[in-house]
Regions:
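Surface-exposed, charge/polar-rich loops and edge strands
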Residues: 1-189
Length: 189
């Protein structure tokens, strides 16, 4: 979990500044964790969308077509395995893919974006919670990519079939519910 990794990195960064006695009692030594049943209707999982900055849409779409060709992925809107919405300031394009090796839609997208970013150092990607925020950023001249809804029942089969989940696969809860990340850290830096 990225939050756990962030908490550990924070602890590792302050640990050298503490005495042995302070290390044993400092609150940053521990993390806040919640154990819950994923099957509970109270747990809502949402896809985390992508926004690409600093890339011309034509360049990214051409790279996506080349990536799909290399991977044997068919681009089609006829009974697609996965469906994405690509947003620019002027257009919204529905892109369907079939014959994907990844058991999760986000896996295909992450592989393609990773390859693109490696060859285009001027471009960056950010991980965005919420469709409205993706649309707002795309309207400003960036490229928004809306992932399909993340289905809870796809989580464990996705891990079994694909191994480690791709970066920022899903979020539990809505963006505005994530305030605790900041508030808990503020208790004591």
């Amino acid at each position: 979990n990225h939050s756990l990794a962030t908490a550990k990195a924070h602890w590792e960064s302050i640990k050298p500044t503490l005495s042995e006695a302070e290390r044993k009692t400092h609150p940053a030594r521990w993390c806040l964790a919640e154990v819950c049943n994923l099957h509970s209707p109270a747990i809502q999982m949402e896809a985390i969308h992508r926004v690409v900055f600093g890339a011309p849409a034509a360049s990214l779409l051409l790279a996506a077509v080349e990536f799909c060709d290399q991977e044997g992925i068919e681009i089609t809107n006829q009974r697609p395995q996965y469906e994405y919405h690509v947003l620019t300031a002027r257009k919204q394009i529905k892109v369907g893919l079939r014959h994907c090796k990844s058991p999760l839609a986000v896996g295909v997208l992450e592989a393609m974006l990773g390859e693109y970013l490696a060859g285009h150092k001027e471009a960056t990607v950010d991980y965005i919670h919420g469709e409205s925020e993706v649309r707002r950023l795309a309207a400003e001249g960036n490229i928004g990519i809306l992932l399909p809804e993340f289905q809870k029942d796809g989580l464990f089969p996705g891990v079994v079939q694909g191994g480690v989940l791709p970066k920022k696969t899903f979020s539990i809860g809505h963006a505005e519910e994530k305030r605790c990340y900041f508030e808990c850290r503020r208790i004591r830096p």
